[in-house]
Protein backbone atom coordinates (compact mmCIF):
# COMPACT_ATOMS: atom_id res chain seq x y z
CA UNK A 1 0.00 0.00 0.00
CA UNK A 2 1.83 3.08 -1.25
CA UNK A 3 -0.43 5.83 0.08
CA UNK A 4 0.20 6.90 3.67
CA UNK A 5 -1.45 9.15 6.25
CA UNK A 6 0.53 10.12 9.34
CA UNK A 7 -1.56 11.02 12.40
CA UNK A 8 -0.23 12.79 15.49
CA UNK A 9 -2.07 12.21 18.78
CA UNK A 10 -1.84 14.91 21.45
CA UNK A 11 -2.37 13.40 24.90
CA UNK A 12 -3.35 10.02 23.46
CA UNK A 13 -1.04 7.87 25.57
CA UNK A 14 -3.68 5.26 26.46
CA UNK A 15 -5.81 5.47 23.31
CA UNK A 16 -4.59 2.20 21.82
CA UNK A 17 -8.03 1.05 20.68
CA UNK A 18 -8.72 4.37 18.96
CA UNK A 19 -5.33 4.15 17.24
CA UNK A 20 -6.29 0.70 15.96
CA UNK A 21 -9.61 2.11 14.75
CA UNK A 22 -7.74 4.78 12.77
CA UNK A 23 -5.46 2.14 11.26
CA UNK A 24 -8.46 0.03 10.22
CA UNK A 25 -10.26 3.09 8.84
CA UNK A 26 -7.17 3.76 6.74
CA UNK A 27 -7.33 0.26 5.30
CA UNK A 28 -11.01 0.84 4.51
CA UNK A 29 -10.22 3.95 2.44
CA UNK A 30 -7.05 2.55 0.87
CA UNK A 31 -4.37 4.23 2.98
CA UNK A 32 -1.69 3.06 5.38
CA UNK A 33 -2.19 5.00 8.62
CA UNK A 34 0.82 5.57 10.87
CA UNK A 35 0.24 6.73 14.43
CA UNK A 36 2.55 9.09 16.29
CA UNK A 37 1.88 10.31 19.82
CA UNK A 38 3.32 13.36 21.57
CA UNK A 39 4.20 12.25 25.12
CA UNK A 40 6.36 13.14 28.11
CA UNK A 41 7.75 9.59 28.45
CA UNK A 42 8.49 6.68 26.13
CA UNK A 43 6.74 4.22 28.42
CA UNK A 44 3.15 4.66 27.29
CA UNK A 45 0.68 2.02 25.99
CA UNK A 46 0.33 3.82 22.64
CA UNK A 47 3.89 2.65 21.82
CA UNK A 48 2.33 -0.76 21.14
CA UNK A 49 0.72 0.53 17.93
CA UNK A 50 2.58 3.73 17.11
CA UNK A 51 5.67 5.85 17.52
CA UNK A 52 6.14 8.01 20.60
CA UNK A 53 7.50 11.49 20.03
CA UNK A 54 9.15 12.90 23.19
CA UNK A 55 7.38 16.17 23.90
CA UNK A 56 7.06 19.19 26.17
CA UNK A 57 4.41 20.09 28.74
CA UNK A 58 1.39 21.93 27.38
CA UNK A 59 2.28 25.10 29.31
CA UNK A 60 5.86 25.22 27.99
CA UNK A 61 6.71 28.46 26.18
CA UNK A 62 8.20 26.46 23.30
CA UNK A 63 5.30 24.03 22.85
CA UNK A 64 4.07 25.50 19.55
CA UNK A 65 7.54 25.69 18.01
CA UNK A 66 8.35 22.15 19.13
CA UNK A 67 5.08 20.76 17.82
CA UNK A 68 5.51 22.60 14.52
CA UNK A 69 8.97 21.01 14.16
CA UNK A 70 7.49 17.61 15.07
CA UNK A 71 4.84 17.98 12.37
CA UNK A 72 7.51 18.78 9.77
CA UNK A 73 10.00 16.12 10.91
CA UNK A 74 7.45 13.29 10.91
CA UNK A 75 5.49 14.54 7.89
CA UNK A 76 2.27 14.69 9.90
CA UNK A 77 -0.98 14.99 7.94
CA UNK A 78 -3.58 14.99 10.74
CA UNK A 79 -3.41 16.16 14.37
CA UNK A 80 -5.92 14.79 16.90
CA UNK A 81 -6.18 16.18 20.47
CA UNK A 82 -7.35 13.90 23.30
CA UNK A 83 -7.20 16.29 26.28
CA UNK A 84 -8.95 19.62 26.67
CA UNK A 85 -5.89 21.87 26.81
CA UNK A 86 -4.57 20.23 23.64
CA UNK A 87 -7.60 21.55 21.74
CA UNK A 88 -6.36 25.08 22.42
CA UNK A 89 -2.84 24.14 21.39
CA UNK A 90 -4.26 22.66 18.16
CA UNK A 91 -6.23 25.80 17.38
CA UNK A 92 -3.08 27.90 17.71
CA UNK A 93 -1.04 25.43 15.66
CA UNK A 94 -3.64 25.58 12.92
CA UNK A 95 -2.71 29.21 12.31
CA UNK A 96 0.95 28.42 11.61
CA UNK A 97 0.85 24.99 9.92
CA UNK A 98 -0.28 24.68 6.32
CA UNK A 99 -1.53 21.52 4.62
CA UNK A 100 -2.22 19.82 7.95
CA UNK A 101 -5.71 18.79 9.05
CA UNK A 102 -6.47 19.69 12.68
CA UNK A 103 -9.49 17.94 14.24
CA UNK A 104 -10.62 20.93 16.27
CA UNK A 105 -13.30 23.57 16.59
CA UNK A 106 -12.52 27.30 16.58
CA UNK A 107 -10.12 28.73 19.17
CA UNK A 108 -12.87 30.75 20.87
CA UNK A 109 -14.99 27.62 21.40
CA UNK A 110 -12.05 25.57 22.66
CA UNK A 111 -10.96 28.30 25.08
CA UNK A 112 -14.52 28.75 26.38
CA UNK A 113 -15.16 25.04 26.92
CA UNK A 114 -11.81 24.55 28.67
CA UNK A 115 -12.91 26.94 31.45
CA UNK A 116 -15.89 25.74 33.54
CA UNK A 117 -17.00 29.28 34.45
CA UNK A 118 -16.76 30.55 30.88
CA UNK A 119 -18.63 27.53 29.54
CA UNK A 120 -21.34 27.94 32.19
CA UNK A 121 -21.83 31.55 31.05
CA UNK A 122 -21.91 30.38 27.42
CA UNK A 123 -24.66 27.89 28.27
CA UNK A 124 -26.67 30.58 30.08
CA UNK A 125 -26.19 33.08 27.24
CA UNK A 126 -27.58 30.51 24.80
CA UNK A 127 -30.51 29.69 27.08
CA UNK A 128 -29.46 26.11 27.77
CA UNK A 129 -30.60 24.35 30.93
CA UNK A 130 -27.71 24.01 33.39
CA UNK A 131 -27.53 23.16 37.11
CA UNK A 132 -27.71 26.33 39.19
CA UNK A 133 -24.55 27.79 40.69
CA UNK A 134 -24.36 27.59 44.48
CA UNK A 135 -23.09 25.59 47.43
CA UNK A 136 -26.37 24.60 49.07
CA UNK A 137 -26.20 20.92 49.94
CA UNK A 138 -25.82 18.73 48.01
CA UNK A 139 -23.53 20.33 45.43
CA UNK A 140 -20.76 19.48 42.99
CA UNK A 141 -17.48 21.40 42.99
CA UNK A 142 -15.59 21.32 39.68
CA UNK A 143 -12.06 22.57 39.20
CA UNK A 144 -12.39 25.40 36.68
CA UNK A 145 -9.81 23.91 34.31
CA UNK A 146 -10.21 20.29 35.38
CA UNK A 147 -10.99 17.49 32.94
CA UNK A 148 -11.66 13.77 32.99
CA UNK A 149 -13.27 13.99 36.42
CA UNK A 150 -10.05 15.36 37.97
CA UNK A 151 -10.56 17.98 40.66
CA UNK A 152 -14.26 17.17 41.13
CA UNK A 153 -15.92 16.88 44.53
CA UNK A 154 -19.41 15.63 45.37
CA UNK A 155 -20.36 17.39 48.60
CA UNK A 156 -23.42 15.93 50.34
CA UNK A 157 -23.02 16.76 54.04
CA UNK A 158 -22.01 19.72 56.19
CA UNK A 159 -18.91 17.83 57.31
CA UNK A 160 -17.87 17.27 53.68
CA UNK A 161 -18.56 20.93 52.94
CA UNK A 162 -16.34 22.05 55.81
CA UNK A 163 -13.57 19.72 54.65
CA UNK A 164 -13.84 20.95 51.07
CA UNK A 165 -13.51 24.62 52.04
CA UNK A 166 -10.67 23.83 54.45
CA UNK A 167 -8.62 22.01 51.84
CA UNK A 168 -9.38 24.00 48.69
CA UNK A 169 -9.42 27.54 47.33
CA UNK A 170 -13.07 28.21 46.48
CA UNK A 171 -12.24 30.58 43.60
CA UNK A 172 -10.58 27.68 41.77
CA UNK A 173 -13.91 25.88 41.53
CA UNK A 174 -17.36 26.14 40.00
CA UNK A 175 -20.01 25.01 42.49
CA UNK A 176 -23.31 23.71 41.12
CA UNK A 177 -26.41 22.01 42.47
CA UNK A 178 -26.01 18.24 42.51
CA UNK A 179 -28.38 16.69 39.97
CA UNK A 180 -29.24 13.05 40.49
CA UNK A 181 -30.06 11.24 37.28
CA UNK A 182 -28.87 9.37 34.21
CA UNK A 183 -25.73 10.62 32.48
CA UNK A 184 -25.33 10.70 28.71
CA UNK A 185 -22.35 11.37 26.48
CA UNK A 186 -23.10 12.32 22.89
CA UNK A 187 -20.48 11.63 20.24
CA UNK A 188 -20.85 14.13 17.40
CA UNK A 189 -18.96 14.86 14.22
CA UNK A 190 -19.10 17.94 12.00
CA UNK A 191 -17.19 17.98 8.72
CA UNK A 192 -14.80 20.68 7.52
CA UNK A 193 -17.79 22.67 6.23
CA UNK A 194 -19.46 22.47 9.69
CA UNK A 195 -22.14 20.08 8.43
CA UNK A 196 -23.38 17.69 11.12
CA UNK A 197 -22.48 14.14 10.05
CA UNK A 198 -23.53 12.09 13.07
CA UNK A 199 -24.95 12.43 16.58
CA UNK A 200 -24.87 9.31 18.77
CA UNK A 201 -26.05 9.45 22.41
CA UNK A 202 -24.74 6.80 24.76
CA UNK A 203 -25.88 6.22 28.30
CA UNK A 204 -23.01 6.15 30.82
CA UNK A 205 -23.70 3.08 32.94
CA UNK A 206 -20.38 2.93 34.77
CA UNK A 207 -17.46 5.33 35.03
CA UNK A 208 -13.92 5.20 36.39
CA UNK A 209 -11.95 8.42 36.89
CA UNK A 210 -14.42 10.30 34.73
CA UNK A 211 -14.28 7.86 31.81
CA UNK A 212 -17.11 5.54 30.79
CA UNK A 213 -16.18 1.90 31.29
CA UNK A 214 -19.66 0.64 30.46
CA UNK A 215 -21.99 2.50 28.11
CA UNK A 216 -24.84 1.74 25.72
CA UNK A 217 -26.06 3.60 22.63
CA UNK A 218 -29.59 4.99 22.86
CA UNK A 219 -31.63 6.71 20.16
CA UNK A 220 -32.93 9.40 22.52
CA UNK A 221 -34.62 11.91 20.21
CA UNK A 222 -34.77 14.68 22.80
CA UNK A 223 -31.04 14.51 23.35
CA UNK A 224 -30.32 14.19 19.62
CA UNK A 225 -32.39 17.31 18.82
CA UNK A 226 -30.86 19.26 21.71
CA UNK A 227 -27.36 18.27 20.59
CA UNK A 228 -28.14 19.39 17.04
CA UNK A 229 -29.34 22.75 18.38
CA UNK A 230 -26.17 23.20 20.45
CA UNK A 231 -23.85 22.35 17.55
CA UNK A 232 -25.45 25.15 15.53
CA UNK A 233 -24.85 27.73 18.28
CA UNK A 234 -21.06 27.88 17.99
CA UNK A 235 -18.15 27.49 15.59
CA UNK A 236 -17.86 23.73 16.06
CA UNK A 237 -16.14 21.33 13.69
CA UNK A 238 -14.58 17.88 13.87
CA UNK A 239 -15.34 15.63 16.84
CA UNK A 240 -17.40 17.07 19.70
CA UNK A 241 -18.54 15.30 22.88
CA UNK A 242 -21.51 16.75 24.77
CA UNK A 243 -22.35 15.65 28.32
CA UNK A 244 -25.92 15.70 29.65
CA UNK A 245 -27.72 14.47 32.73
CA UNK A 246 -31.44 13.65 32.78
CA UNK A 247 -32.74 14.44 36.26
CA UNK A 248 -34.37 11.51 38.04
CA UNK A 249 -37.28 13.40 39.61
CA UNK A 250 -38.15 15.91 36.86
CA UNK A 251 -36.83 14.29 33.63
CA UNK A 252 -35.25 17.68 32.90
CA UNK A 253 -32.22 17.56 30.61
CA UNK A 254 -29.23 19.52 31.92
CA UNK A 255 -26.09 20.18 29.93
CA UNK A 256 -22.98 19.45 31.97
CA UNK A 257 -20.10 20.21 29.61
CA UNK A 258 -18.89 20.19 26.03
CA UNK A 259 -15.53 18.70 25.09
CA UNK A 260 -14.62 19.76 21.54
CA UNK A 261 -12.60 16.59 20.92
CA UNK A 262 -12.97 12.81 20.80
CA UNK A 263 -14.47 11.36 23.98
CA UNK A 264 -12.70 8.56 25.81
CA UNK A 265 -15.50 6.07 25.03
CA UNK A 266 -16.11 7.16 21.44
CA UNK A 267 -15.37 3.59 20.36
CA UNK A 268 -18.92 2.73 21.44
CA UNK A 269 -20.29 4.99 18.71
CA UNK A 270 -17.68 3.83 16.21
CA UNK A 271 -18.64 0.19 16.82
CA UNK A 272 -22.29 1.19 16.45
CA UNK A 273 -21.64 2.43 12.91
CA UNK A 274 -20.76 6.12 13.31
CA UNK A 275 -17.10 5.72 12.36
CA UNK A 276 -15.61 9.05 13.41
CA UNK A 277 -12.08 7.81 12.67
CA UNK A 278 -13.10 7.22 9.06
CA UNK A 279 -14.86 10.61 8.94
CA UNK A 280 -11.62 12.32 9.99
CA UNK A 281 -9.65 10.58 7.23
CA UNK A 282 -12.28 11.47 4.62
CA UNK A 283 -12.31 15.07 5.83
CA UNK A 284 -8.53 15.26 5.43
CA UNK A 285 -8.85 13.78 1.93
CA UNK A 286 -11.59 16.35 1.16
CA UNK A 287 -14.07 13.60 0.35
CA UNK A 288 -17.73 14.36 1.05
CA UNK A 289 -19.11 12.55 4.10
CA UNK A 290 -22.82 11.69 3.93
CA UNK A 291 -24.92 12.28 7.04
CA UNK A 292 -25.26 9.07 9.04
CA UNK A 293 -28.26 8.31 11.24
CA UNK A 294 -28.09 4.57 10.59
CA UNK A 295 -26.20 3.47 13.68
CA UNK A 296 -26.92 0.53 15.97
CA UNK A 297 -29.05 1.29 19.01
CA UNK A 298 -28.64 -0.67 22.27
CA UNK A 299 -25.01 -1.52 21.58
CA UNK A 300 -23.34 -2.14 24.93
CA UNK A 301 -19.65 -1.39 25.43
CA UNK A 302 -17.84 -2.98 28.37
CA UNK A 303 -14.24 -1.85 28.81
CA UNK A 304 -11.47 -4.17 29.96
CA UNK A 305 -7.87 -3.47 30.89
CA UNK A 306 -4.73 -4.60 29.10
CA UNK A 307 -1.17 -4.56 30.36
CA UNK A 308 1.85 -3.35 28.37
CA UNK A 309 5.48 -4.04 29.23
CA UNK A 310 8.69 -2.09 28.70
CA UNK A 311 12.36 -2.68 29.46
CA UNK A 312 13.44 0.42 31.40
CA UNK A 313 17.09 0.21 32.43
What are the functions of these language-model segments?
Residues 30-32, 172, 237-241:
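Short secondary-structure junction motifs
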Residues 46-47, 62-65, 110-117, 209-210:
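Short, charged, surface-exposed secondary-structure boundary motifs
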Residues 1-102:
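ATP-binding N-terminal substructure of ATP-dependent carboxylate-amine bond-forming enzymes
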Residues 156-235, 245-254:
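Phosphate-binding site of ATP-dependent enzymes
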Residues 74, 219-313:
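ATP-dependent carboxylate activation and anion-phosphoryl transfer catalytic cores
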Residues 107-180, 191-195, 221-224:
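Active-site nucleotide/adenylate-binding loops and adjacent lid/helix of ATP-dependent enzymes
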Residues 87-88, 148, 263, 267:
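Short glycine-rich, flexible loops that bind phosphorylated cofactors or substrates
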Amino acid sequence: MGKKINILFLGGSKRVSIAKAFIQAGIDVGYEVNIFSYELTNFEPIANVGTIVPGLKWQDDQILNHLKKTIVDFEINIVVPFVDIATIVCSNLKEVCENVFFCVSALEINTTMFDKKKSHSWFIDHKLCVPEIGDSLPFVAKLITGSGGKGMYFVKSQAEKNTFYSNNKATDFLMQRFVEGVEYSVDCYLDRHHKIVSIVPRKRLETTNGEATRSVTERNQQIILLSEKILKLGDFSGPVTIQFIVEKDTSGIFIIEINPRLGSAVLTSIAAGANICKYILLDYLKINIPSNQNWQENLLMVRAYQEFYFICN
